[in-house]
């Protein structure tokens, strides 16, 4: 089975398990959430590698700085030690805020992927749609975590995304696609880290074991 097929199968199984949850305990919910967020980050990394396989050298020069990511204004822990000091409900809100912030950008990437000037565009298109499905499933799962924890479902940071185009020429579109994906990959790692800290706390492990 090819890498993409294996990853798709694993993500699909996790998604089906997540959306069918009823009466599952908090520990199990967070375990499944952290598994799904890990797949999310793995998929974004795989997509980045696909893009890098045929990326023009000029694209590296044109690439915006990470500080230009639309989620860069969100104040978040920089590492695990800082995350361990953040209250559970706040950490969950940060993960959900980041996840919600990628709804529109991923819709844009999904709509543009099939027409990218890239030899792997079919694979990129397929994986981008998987990302959308993955995010929707994780978002639904985190709503269940909110309910279990008794946290506020409205305590989310607004991180609007205003662009509705990746550019007019093929190079700009490819560069901006890569840039958005790199921003998402960074944020997916943060989401994964936050959920793993929450899972660790729910299991009442010592901080040094997290």
From Swiss-Prot:
Its main location: secreted. GO terms for cellular component: extracellular space. Pfam families: Hormone_1. One of its GO terms (molecular function) is hormone activity. Keywords: Disulfide bond, Hormone, Secreted, Signal. Disulfide bonds join 69-183, 200-210. GO terms for biological process: positive regulation of cell population proliferation; positive regulation of receptor signaling pathway via JAK-STAT; response to nutrient levels. InterPro entries: 4_helix_cytokine-like_core (IPR009079), Somatotropin/Prolactin (IPR001400), Somatotropin_CS (IPR018116). It is found in: Secreted. Residues 1-23 form the signal peptide. The keyword Secreted applies. Pituitary gland. Belongs to the somatotropin/prolactin family. This is Prolactin. The gene is prl.
């Amino acid at each position: 089975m090819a890498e993409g097929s294996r990853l798709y199968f694993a993500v699909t199984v996790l998604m089906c398990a997540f959306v069918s949850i009823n009466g599952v305990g908090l520990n199990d919910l967070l375990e499944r959430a952290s598994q799904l967020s890990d797949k999310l980050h793995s998929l974004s990394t795989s997509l980045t590698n696909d893009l890098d396989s045929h990326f023009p050298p000029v694209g590296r020069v044109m690439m915006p700085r990470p500080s230009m990511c639309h989620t860069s204004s969100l104040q978040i822990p920089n590492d695990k030690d800082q995350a361990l000091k953040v209250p559970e409900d706040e950490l969950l809100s940060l993960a959900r805020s980041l996840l919600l912030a990628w709804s529109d950008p991923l819709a844009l990437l999904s709509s543009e992927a099939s027409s990218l000037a890239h030899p792997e565009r079919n694979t990129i298109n397929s994986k981008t749609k998987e990302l959308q499905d993955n995010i929707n499933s994780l978002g639904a799962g985190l709503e269940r975590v909110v309910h279990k924890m008794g946290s506020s479902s409205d305590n989310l940071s607004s991180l609007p995304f205003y662009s509705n185009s990746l550019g007019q020429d093929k190079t700009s579109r490819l560069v901006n696609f890569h840039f958005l994906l790199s921003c998402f990959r960074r944020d997916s790692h943060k989401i994964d880290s936050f959920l793993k800290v929450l899972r660790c706390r729910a299991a009442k492990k010592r901080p040094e074991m997290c």
